[in-house]
């Protein structure tokens, strides 16, 4: 995906809120927008159909 290691870290090391799909920092415990506690790590690979 990204050309450089630091670029891919910036793009992929995120948490995604399961309720509102907001991007949050990796260390987040709850969503910054809606306060929901169920966060998932952002997918590192694209999904195939």
From Swiss-Prot:
Keyword set, alphabetical order: Ribonucleoprotein, Ribosomal protein
Gene Ontology biological-process annotations: translation
Q: Which GO terms describe its molecular function?
A: structural constituent of ribosome
Note the superkingdom of the native organism: Archaea
Cite the Gene3D superfamilies for this sequence.
4.10.1060.50
Q: Does the keyword Glycosyltransferase apply?
A: no
Annotated GO CC locations: ribonucleoprotein complex; ribosome
Per the record's keyword annotation, is Ribonucleoprotein included, yes or no? yes
* Cited InterPro entries: Ribosomal_eL40_arc (IPR023657), Ribosomal_eL40_dom (IPR001975), Ribosomal_eL40_sf (IPR038587), Ribosomal_zn-bd (IPR011332)
Instruction: Name the protein family.
Output: Belongs to the eukaryotic ribosomal protein eL40 family.
Q: What is this protein called?
A: Large ribosomal subunit protein eL40
Organism expressing this protein natively = Haloarcula marismortui (strain ATCC 43049 / DSM 3752 / JCM 8966 / VKM B-1809) (Halobacterium marismortui)
């Amino acid at each position: 995906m990204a050309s450089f290691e630091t670029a891919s870290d910036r793009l992929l090391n995120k948490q995604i809120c399961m309720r509102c799909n907001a991007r949050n920092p990796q260390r987040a415990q709850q969503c910054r927008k809606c306060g929901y506690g169920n966060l998932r790590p952002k997918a590192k690979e694209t999904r195939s159909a």
